[in-house]
Amino acid sequence: ALPILSHYYDTDPNYRNKYIPILDVIEELATKFDNQERYKNSRVLKSLSTSRKYRYLNTSLQEFTRSKYHRDFTKYRFRDLTEKFLQDFVVWIQVRAAKRGNTGDVSGKLRKLKAVCLYAKEQGVYNVNLNAFGSFKEKLKHRITTPKGVSPEVMQQIESFDRMLLTKKEQFYLDLFLFSYYAGGMSAIDVCLLTRDQIKDDQIIYERTKYDKQARVIIIDKAADIIERYRTEAYMNYVFPTIKRCNPTQQKLYGRVKRINEKVNETLQKICDRCSIKSRVTWGTARSSYISKMIDEGFHPLQVAELAGNSPQTIYRHYYTISDKEKMKGKMNDIF
Protein backbone atom coordinates (compact mmCIF):
# COMPACT_ATOMS: atom_id res chain seq x y z
CA ALA A 1 0.00 0.00 0.00
CA LEU A 2 1.13 3.52 -0.76
CA PRO A 3 2.10 5.56 2.31
CA ILE A 4 -0.25 8.45 3.00
CA LEU A 5 1.67 11.67 3.47
CA SER A 6 0.54 13.38 6.65
CA HIS A 7 0.49 16.83 5.05
CA TYR A 8 -1.91 15.61 2.34
CA TYR A 9 -4.87 16.31 4.64
CA ASP A 10 -3.33 19.38 6.26
CA THR A 11 -5.78 22.27 6.15
CA ASP A 12 -3.42 24.90 7.50
CA PRO A 13 -3.27 27.43 4.60
CA ASN A 14 0.25 28.50 5.55
CA TYR A 15 1.44 24.94 5.17
CA ARG A 16 -0.42 24.08 1.98
CA ASN A 17 0.88 27.33 0.55
CA LYS A 18 4.35 25.75 0.30
CA TYR A 19 3.11 23.82 -2.77
CA ILE A 20 1.38 26.82 -4.37
CA PRO A 21 1.08 26.73 -8.21
CA ILE A 22 3.36 29.08 -10.18
CA LEU A 23 0.31 30.83 -11.64
CA ASP A 24 -0.91 31.82 -8.16
CA VAL A 25 2.48 33.26 -7.15
CA ILE A 26 2.59 35.37 -10.34
CA GLU A 27 -0.92 36.68 -9.60
CA GLU A 28 0.12 37.37 -5.99
CA LEU A 29 3.05 39.47 -7.26
CA ALA A 30 0.81 41.30 -9.75
CA THR A 31 -1.62 42.16 -6.94
CA LYS A 32 1.30 43.35 -4.82
CA PHE A 33 2.32 45.79 -7.58
CA ASP A 34 -1.33 46.83 -8.04
CA ASN A 35 -1.21 48.16 -4.48
CA GLN A 36 2.41 49.33 -4.36
CA GLU A 37 2.51 53.11 -4.09
CA ARG A 38 5.31 55.48 -5.08
CA TYR A 39 5.53 59.17 -4.29
CA LYS A 40 6.54 61.16 -7.37
CA ASN A 41 6.42 64.95 -7.78
CA SER A 42 3.79 65.48 -5.04
CA ARG A 43 1.66 62.66 -6.44
CA VAL A 44 1.04 59.10 -5.22
CA LEU A 45 1.30 56.62 -8.10
CA LYS A 46 0.79 52.85 -8.26
CA SER A 47 2.90 50.38 -10.26
CA LEU A 48 0.10 49.39 -12.63
CA SER A 49 2.33 48.86 -15.69
CA THR A 50 4.52 46.40 -13.73
CA SER A 51 1.51 44.39 -12.52
CA ARG A 52 0.24 44.30 -16.11
CA LYS A 53 3.56 42.76 -17.25
CA TYR A 54 3.27 39.99 -14.65
CA ARG A 55 -0.29 39.21 -15.77
CA TYR A 56 0.88 39.13 -19.38
CA LEU A 57 3.61 36.65 -18.32
CA ASN A 58 0.88 34.46 -16.80
CA THR A 59 -1.11 34.59 -20.05
CA SER A 60 2.00 33.73 -22.11
CA LEU A 61 2.81 30.74 -19.88
CA GLN A 62 -0.78 29.48 -20.10
CA GLU A 63 -0.69 29.68 -23.91
CA PHE A 64 2.75 28.03 -23.98
CA THR A 65 1.91 24.98 -21.82
CA ARG A 66 -1.34 24.42 -23.73
CA SER A 67 0.42 24.70 -27.09
CA LYS A 68 3.61 22.76 -26.26
CA TYR A 69 2.57 20.20 -23.64
CA HIS A 70 -1.25 20.20 -23.94
CA ARG A 71 -1.39 20.83 -20.20
CA ASP A 72 -3.10 23.49 -18.14
CA PHE A 73 -0.61 25.89 -16.54
CA THR A 74 -2.69 25.96 -13.33
CA LYS A 75 -1.32 22.47 -12.58
CA TYR A 76 2.35 23.57 -12.74
CA ARG A 77 4.31 23.76 -9.48
CA PHE A 78 7.85 25.10 -9.05
CA ARG A 79 9.35 21.60 -9.35
CA ASP A 80 8.13 21.66 -12.98
CA LEU A 81 10.08 24.83 -13.76
CA THR A 82 13.21 23.08 -15.06
CA GLU A 83 15.95 24.16 -17.47
CA LYS A 84 14.20 22.13 -20.22
CA PHE A 85 10.92 23.94 -19.51
CA LEU A 86 12.69 27.31 -19.81
CA GLN A 87 14.45 26.28 -23.05
CA ASP A 88 11.14 25.21 -24.57
CA PHE A 89 9.50 28.46 -23.40
CA VAL A 90 12.27 30.60 -24.96
CA VAL A 91 12.04 28.79 -28.32
CA TRP A 92 8.22 29.06 -28.28
CA ILE A 93 8.44 32.84 -27.64
CA GLN A 94 11.02 33.29 -30.42
CA VAL A 95 9.04 31.30 -33.01
CA ARG A 96 5.82 33.16 -32.19
CA ALA A 97 7.62 36.53 -32.21
CA ALA A 98 9.19 35.83 -35.62
CA LYS A 99 5.70 35.21 -37.06
CA ARG A 100 4.52 38.50 -35.56
CA GLY A 101 7.57 40.46 -36.66
CA ASN A 102 8.85 41.40 -33.18
CA THR A 103 11.41 40.19 -30.62
CA GLY A 104 8.93 38.75 -28.10
CA ASP A 105 10.94 40.36 -25.26
CA VAL A 106 12.52 37.04 -24.23
CA SER A 107 14.85 38.68 -21.69
CA GLY A 108 11.99 40.64 -20.11
CA LYS A 109 9.86 37.51 -19.64
CA LEU A 110 12.79 35.49 -18.25
CA ARG A 111 13.70 38.26 -15.80
CA LYS A 112 10.09 38.44 -14.60
CA LEU A 113 9.94 34.65 -14.22
CA LYS A 114 13.20 34.62 -12.25
CA ALA A 115 11.80 37.40 -10.03
CA VAL A 116 8.76 35.17 -9.42
CA CYS A 117 11.08 32.32 -8.34
CA LEU A 118 13.08 34.60 -6.02
CA TYR A 119 9.85 35.88 -4.47
CA ALA A 120 8.55 32.31 -4.03
CA LYS A 121 11.83 31.24 -2.39
CA GLU A 122 11.57 34.18 0.03
CA GLN A 123 8.03 33.03 0.88
CA GLY A 124 9.34 29.54 1.69
CA VAL A 125 7.67 27.80 -1.26
CA TYR A 126 9.08 24.31 -1.86
CA ASN A 127 11.09 23.06 -4.85
CA VAL A 128 12.13 26.44 -6.27
CA ASN A 129 15.13 25.77 -8.52
CA LEU A 130 17.02 28.98 -9.39
CA ASN A 131 19.79 26.90 -11.04
CA ALA A 132 17.38 26.32 -13.93
CA PHE A 133 18.19 29.88 -15.07
CA GLY A 134 21.97 29.17 -15.08
CA SER A 135 22.34 28.71 -18.84
CA PHE A 136 20.30 31.84 -19.64
CA LYS A 137 22.76 34.45 -18.32
CA GLU A 138 23.00 36.24 -21.68
CA LYS A 139 19.25 36.25 -22.23
CA LEU A 140 18.63 37.55 -18.69
CA LYS A 141 20.67 40.67 -19.43
CA HIS A 142 18.79 43.86 -20.23
CA ARG A 143 18.27 44.00 -23.98
CA ILE A 144 20.14 46.96 -25.43
CA THR A 145 17.50 48.98 -27.18
CA THR A 146 18.11 50.29 -30.66
CA PRO A 147 18.49 54.07 -30.34
CA LYS A 148 15.41 55.84 -31.64
CA GLY A 149 17.15 59.15 -32.30
CA VAL A 150 17.02 60.89 -35.68
CA SER A 151 19.45 63.32 -37.28
CA PRO A 152 19.36 67.07 -36.47
CA GLU A 153 18.26 67.63 -40.10
CA VAL A 154 15.11 65.53 -39.58
CA MET A 155 14.36 67.37 -36.32
CA GLN A 156 14.83 70.66 -38.19
CA GLN A 157 12.27 69.57 -40.80
CA ILE A 158 9.76 68.72 -38.07
CA GLU A 159 10.39 72.03 -36.26
CA SER A 160 9.89 74.12 -39.40
CA PHE A 161 6.86 72.19 -40.72
CA ASP A 162 4.10 74.48 -42.07
CA ARG A 163 1.59 74.66 -39.21
CA MET A 164 -1.14 75.79 -41.60
CA LEU A 165 -1.31 72.14 -42.68
CA LEU A 166 -2.15 71.07 -39.11
CA THR A 167 -5.34 71.44 -37.07
CA LYS A 168 -5.17 73.40 -33.80
CA LYS A 169 -5.03 70.14 -31.83
CA GLU A 170 -2.30 68.72 -34.06
CA GLN A 171 -0.28 71.90 -33.51
CA PHE A 172 -0.63 71.28 -29.76
CA TYR A 173 0.55 67.65 -30.15
CA LEU A 174 3.54 68.84 -32.19
CA ASP A 175 4.35 71.39 -29.46
CA LEU A 176 4.32 68.64 -26.80
CA PHE A 177 6.87 66.68 -28.83
CA LEU A 178 9.08 69.72 -29.47
CA PHE A 179 8.89 70.76 -25.82
CA SER A 180 10.05 67.26 -24.87
CA TYR A 181 12.95 67.57 -27.33
CA TYR A 182 13.99 70.97 -25.93
CA ALA A 183 13.55 69.85 -22.30
CA GLY A 184 15.93 66.92 -21.99
CA GLY A 185 13.76 64.39 -23.82
CA MET A 186 11.08 64.42 -21.13
CA SER A 187 8.78 61.37 -21.36
CA ALA A 188 5.09 61.58 -22.27
CA ILE A 189 3.85 61.05 -18.70
CA ASP A 190 6.25 63.64 -17.27
CA VAL A 191 5.24 66.28 -19.84
CA CYS A 192 1.52 65.58 -19.36
CA LEU A 193 1.78 65.76 -15.55
CA LEU A 194 4.19 68.73 -15.44
CA THR A 195 3.06 71.34 -12.92
CA ARG A 196 4.15 74.94 -12.36
CA ASP A 197 5.69 74.22 -8.95
CA GLN A 198 8.29 72.03 -10.71
CA ILE A 199 9.59 75.13 -12.53
CA LYS A 200 12.22 76.96 -10.49
CA ASP A 201 13.51 80.11 -12.24
CA ASP A 202 14.97 78.86 -15.54
CA GLN A 203 14.95 75.18 -14.55
CA ILE A 204 12.50 72.28 -14.40
CA ILE A 205 13.37 70.07 -11.43
CA TYR A 206 11.38 66.84 -11.32
CA GLU A 207 11.65 63.16 -10.43
CA ARG A 208 11.18 60.93 -13.45
CA THR A 209 8.03 58.82 -13.17
CA LYS A 210 9.56 55.73 -14.79
CA TYR A 211 12.83 55.71 -12.81
CA ASP A 212 14.15 56.85 -9.45
CA LYS A 213 16.16 59.64 -11.00
CA GLN A 214 15.87 63.39 -10.64
CA ALA A 215 16.24 65.55 -13.75
CA ARG A 216 17.25 69.21 -13.71
CA VAL A 217 16.34 70.65 -17.09
CA ILE A 218 17.53 74.08 -18.19
CA ILE A 219 14.62 75.84 -19.91
CA ILE A 220 15.89 77.16 -23.24
CA ASP A 221 14.03 79.98 -25.04
CA LYS A 222 12.17 77.66 -27.43
CA ALA A 223 10.83 75.60 -24.50
CA ALA A 224 9.84 78.80 -22.61
CA ASP A 225 7.90 79.99 -25.69
CA ILE A 226 5.87 76.76 -25.77
CA ILE A 227 5.12 77.03 -22.02
CA GLU A 228 3.94 80.61 -22.51
CA ARG A 229 1.78 79.64 -25.51
CA TYR A 230 -0.45 77.45 -23.31
CA ARG A 231 -0.36 79.48 -20.10
CA THR A 232 -4.03 80.53 -20.35
CA GLU A 233 -5.28 77.18 -21.68
CA ALA A 234 -3.82 74.88 -19.00
CA TYR A 235 -6.05 73.58 -16.20
CA MET A 236 -5.37 73.96 -12.49
CA ASN A 237 -1.62 73.93 -11.81
CA TYR A 238 -0.62 72.02 -14.96
CA VAL A 239 1.75 73.60 -17.47
CA PHE A 240 -0.14 72.19 -20.48
CA PRO A 241 -3.86 71.54 -21.15
CA THR A 242 -3.37 67.78 -20.79
CA ILE A 243 -5.21 66.78 -17.58
CA LYS A 244 -8.67 68.30 -17.25
CA ARG A 245 -10.10 66.70 -14.11
CA CYS A 246 -9.30 67.72 -10.57
CA ASN A 247 -8.53 64.30 -9.03
CA PRO A 248 -8.69 61.60 -11.73
CA THR A 249 -8.13 57.97 -10.74
CA GLN A 250 -4.74 56.64 -11.72
CA GLN A 251 -6.39 54.40 -14.33
CA LYS A 252 -7.96 57.45 -16.00
CA LEU A 253 -4.75 59.45 -15.65
CA TYR A 254 -2.68 56.76 -17.38
CA GLY A 255 -5.41 56.29 -20.00
CA ARG A 256 -5.37 60.01 -20.78
CA VAL A 257 -1.56 60.07 -21.12
CA LYS A 258 -1.69 57.01 -23.40
CA ARG A 259 -4.26 58.67 -25.70
CA ILE A 260 -2.22 61.89 -25.89
CA ASN A 261 0.90 59.82 -26.66
CA GLU A 262 -0.96 58.12 -29.53
CA LYS A 263 -2.18 61.48 -30.88
CA VAL A 264 1.36 62.92 -30.77
CA ASN A 265 2.66 59.89 -32.69
CA GLU A 266 -0.15 60.16 -35.27
CA THR A 267 0.68 63.86 -35.79
CA LEU A 268 4.39 63.05 -36.20
CA GLN A 269 3.54 60.34 -38.74
CA LYS A 270 1.46 62.86 -40.72
CA ILE A 271 4.39 65.32 -40.74
CA CYS A 272 6.86 62.60 -41.78
CA ASP A 273 4.58 61.49 -44.62
CA ARG A 274 4.25 65.09 -45.89
CA CYS A 275 8.03 65.67 -45.66
CA SER A 276 8.95 62.22 -47.06
CA ILE A 277 10.90 61.46 -43.87
CA LYS A 278 11.75 57.76 -43.92
CA SER A 279 12.90 57.57 -40.27
CA ARG A 280 10.35 56.39 -37.72
CA VAL A 281 9.64 59.32 -35.41
CA THR A 282 7.66 58.89 -32.18
CA TRP A 283 7.48 60.78 -28.90
CA GLY A 284 10.30 58.54 -27.64
CA THR A 285 12.53 59.87 -30.43
CA ALA A 286 12.83 63.21 -28.61
CA ARG A 287 14.97 61.76 -25.81
CA SER A 288 17.57 60.00 -28.00
CA SER A 289 17.71 62.95 -30.40
CA TYR A 290 18.26 65.43 -27.55
CA ILE A 291 20.99 63.31 -25.91
CA SER A 292 22.78 62.61 -29.22
CA LYS A 293 22.71 66.28 -30.24
CA MET A 294 24.02 67.48 -26.87
CA ILE A 295 26.91 64.99 -26.85
CA ASP A 296 27.77 65.70 -30.50
CA GLU A 297 27.83 69.43 -29.69
CA GLY A 298 30.51 68.77 -27.08
CA PHE A 299 28.57 68.81 -23.79
CA HIS A 300 30.04 66.53 -21.12
CA PRO A 301 28.08 63.26 -20.60
CA LEU A 302 27.73 64.08 -16.87
CA GLN A 303 26.03 67.38 -17.75
CA VAL A 304 23.73 65.65 -20.24
CA ALA A 305 22.95 62.92 -17.69
CA GLU A 306 21.81 65.50 -15.12
CA LEU A 307 19.64 67.31 -17.67
CA ALA A 308 18.04 64.08 -18.90
CA GLY A 309 17.75 62.34 -15.52
CA ASN A 310 19.96 59.37 -16.47
CA SER A 311 23.37 57.95 -15.69
CA PRO A 312 26.13 58.41 -18.33
CA GLN A 313 26.25 54.60 -18.77
CA THR A 314 22.52 54.47 -19.58
CA ILE A 315 22.91 57.35 -22.02
CA TYR A 316 25.56 55.52 -24.02
CA ARG A 317 23.93 52.12 -23.76
CA HIS A 318 20.37 53.08 -24.66
CA TYR A 319 20.13 56.55 -26.15
CA TYR A 320 23.23 57.85 -27.87
CA THR A 321 23.43 57.36 -31.62
CA ILE A 322 25.87 58.87 -34.10
CA SER A 323 23.74 61.54 -35.73
CA ASP A 324 26.03 62.47 -38.63
CA LYS A 325 27.94 59.44 -39.92
CA GLU A 326 29.20 61.27 -43.04
CA LYS A 327 30.76 64.05 -40.96
CA MET A 328 32.32 61.41 -38.71
CA LYS A 329 33.66 59.51 -41.72
CA GLY A 330 35.25 62.72 -43.05
CA LYS A 331 37.00 63.36 -39.73
CA MET A 332 38.19 59.74 -39.56
CA ASN A 333 39.63 59.99 -43.08
CA ASP A 334 41.54 63.09 -41.97
CA ILE A 335 42.87 61.31 -38.86
CA PHE A 336 43.96 58.14 -40.62
What does each model-identified segment do?
Residues 30-49, 58-145, 161-164:
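N-terminal core-binding DNA-recognition domain of tyrosine recombinases/integrases
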Residues 107, 132-188, 192:
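Basic, Lys/Arg- and aromatic-enriched nucleic-acid-binding interface segment
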Residues 135, 193-229:
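Conserved tyrosine-mediated DNA breakage-rejoining catalytic core shared by Y-recombinases
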Residues 166-168, 233, 265-306:
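Short, basic (Lys/Arg/His-rich) helix/loop patches that form interaction surfaces
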Residues 155, 220-278:
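Active-site/catalytic core of tyrosine-dependent DNA strand-transfer enzymes
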Residues 197-205, 278-279, 299-318:
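Short, polar N-cap/turn motifs at the start of nucleic acid-interacting alpha helices
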